[in-house]
Amino acid sequence: MTRRPKSEGDSRPRAPKRLTRASLARGVRALSEVDPDLAGVARAYGTPPLWERAEGFPTLVLTILEQQVSLASALAAFERLRAAASVVTPENFLTFDDARLRAFGFSRQKALYCRLLARAILDGELDLSKLSSFGDAEARSELMRLKGVGAWTAEVYLLRALLRPDAWPAGDLALQLAARQVKRLDARPTAAELDALAEPWRPLRAVAARLLWLQYLEGRRETVRL
């Protein structure tokens, strides 16, 4: 039997449908072979955490809260909601009025976005449990139909909840800052520039994102130690 020669496209590493700790480690090794800068991050800090979140309404609420604020303040607001609701469900969320949500730490806009999300789920307009069977583009499009769910929120949900190996939140500030450092750029890249920079990392951009997040977090710790 004659073996078909590899095409140029075959040189890219293959990606699993869903990342696991084992496939994440394999992905780090694969990216290290094609990008010496990412290899340096892996040598310095090892394989990054999976940073997995459960699929569903609570994770999407938390991700909405994380839009353009510190992760610590978003988590604090979410924990206040969870303490009051016991279980964060669409039904429970809709029992809180705007004043109560503001007391938890929700801005007026984010309270509206989460309320619209809860209603979409209860009205049958959105079934988050079905997203795992969708392709990346379809899952992204389904999420972005919702008011308040933009590209960053959808990509982070794909990356952390659905564990898609090529999810890539190019608008993420921490990714941009880490990429500037790792790639020794003169300025923080824009989302479009980061997309272009990440092209060689397909179809494992979510693995690269975890490496860059790890670089960002470890870099901050080293700065504090100084």
Regions found by a protein language model. Name each.
Residues 18, 37, 41, 69-147, ...:
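Alpha-helical ds-nucleic-acid-binding substructure associated with the helix-hairpin-helix region
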Residues 25, 55-59, 139-140:
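Alpha-helical scaffolds flanking conserved acidic
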Residues 42, 52, 56, 103, ...:
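Non-catalytic interaction surface on structured domains
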Residues 50-58, 105-109, 198-206:
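Structural motif
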Residues 61, 114-117, 179:
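Buried hydrophobic packing segments
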